[in-house]
């Protein structure tokens, strides 16, 4: 529940998104950003998102958990930390035990 990003904000820039300069051209990059670009460019991914959005418009299933690459660069490290602090907390979890 307490990832290193709280004391190492450079993790956000590496994992989330950042700018890179290649051959004089400035591009956006980052682990999550690139993964989501790939997911949003696959026909199967587009179809799945449209189906889920149509079937479950007012639920979390209508949203892509990794984020839309068009909007990922708008996310700031502080917004990410605020979201994490609010939702990724033990008080928001359930524990289920099953068996004999």
Positions of the model-derived regions?
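Charge-rich, well-structured scaffold segments of protease-associated domains
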Residues: 1-100
């Amino acid at each position: 529940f307490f990832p290193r990003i709280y004391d190492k904000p450079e993790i956000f820039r590496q994992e989330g998104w950042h700018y890179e300069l290649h051959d004089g051209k400035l591009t956006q990059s980052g682990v999550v950003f690139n993964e989501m670009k790939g997911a949003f460019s696959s026909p199967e991914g587009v179809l799945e998102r449209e189906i889920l959005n149509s079937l479950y418009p007012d639920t979390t299933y209508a949203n892509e958990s990794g984020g839309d690459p068009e909007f990922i660069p708008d996310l700031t490290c502080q917004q990410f930390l605020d979201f994490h602090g609010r939702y990724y907390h033990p008080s928001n979890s359930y524990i289920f035990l099953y068996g004999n």
